[in-house]
């Protein structure tokens, strides 16, 4: 049981890293705008490939994490889309998600949305939303429950 859960934890961590890299691609997009003006699309294509590969890798890692976690079928919850503050780590990302959404809305209304800080907030909203869904969801909850069972 412990070996399978450690595989599940590893895949879950890999998915989080992949989603972080995917979100970080938004930070590079405005920086490569100058290459579009000069007629070179190579960097845009590379960033697009990185975005899609990390998104796909993150989803596959989540699937493999779910497959390798014991006791997940006993938990009746699904993804953490509409659940908030299910544990301490999730609460941190939920607060960051709310702050990021508010900041993005304010910046979009106050500016024309082309400032670099808008991209930073969009990247933050993307990553914190994904983390919200993962950390409030069934897999992470199952890992916490199994950890508490093994410690007791």
Give the role of each language-model region.
Residues 1-65:
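N-terminal first transmembrane alpha-helix
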Residues 1-9, 78-83, 142-149:
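Cytosolic juxtamembrane N-terminal segments of multi-pass membrane proteins
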Residues 12-19, 89-97:
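Select subsegments of transmembrane alpha-helices in polytopic membrane proteins
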Residues 23, 27-30, 78-81, 105-108, ...:
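Hydrophobic membrane-targeting alpha-helices
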Residues 36-40, 82, 115:
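Juxtamembrane/interface segments of multi-pass membrane proteins
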Residues 62-76, 126-152:
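Cytosolic juxtamembrane helix at the C-terminal end of the final transmembrane segment
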Residues 64-95:
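Loop-to-transmembrane helix junctions at the membrane interface
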Residues 95-124:
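Alpha-helical transmembrane segments and their membrane-interface junctions
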């Amino acid at each position: 049981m412990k070996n399978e859960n450690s595989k599940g934890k590893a895949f879950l961590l890999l998915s989080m890293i992949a989603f972080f890299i995917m979100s970080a691609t938004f930070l590079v997009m405005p920086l490569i705008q100058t290459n579009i003006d000069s007629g070179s699309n190579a960097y845009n294509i590379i960033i697009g490939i990185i975005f899609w590969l990390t998104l796909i890798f993150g989803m596959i890692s989540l699937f493999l994490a779910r497959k390798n976690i014991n006791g997940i079928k006993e938990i009746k919850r699904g993804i953490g889309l509409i659940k908030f503050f299910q544990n301490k780590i999730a609460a941190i990302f939920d607060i960051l998600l709310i702050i990021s959404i508010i900041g993005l809305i304010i910046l979009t209304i106050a500016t024309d949305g082309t400032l670099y800080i808008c991209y930073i907030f969009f990247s933050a909203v993307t990553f914190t939303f994904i983390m919200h869904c993962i950390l409030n969801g069934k897999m992470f909850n199952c890992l916490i429950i199994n950890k508490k069972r093994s410690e007791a």
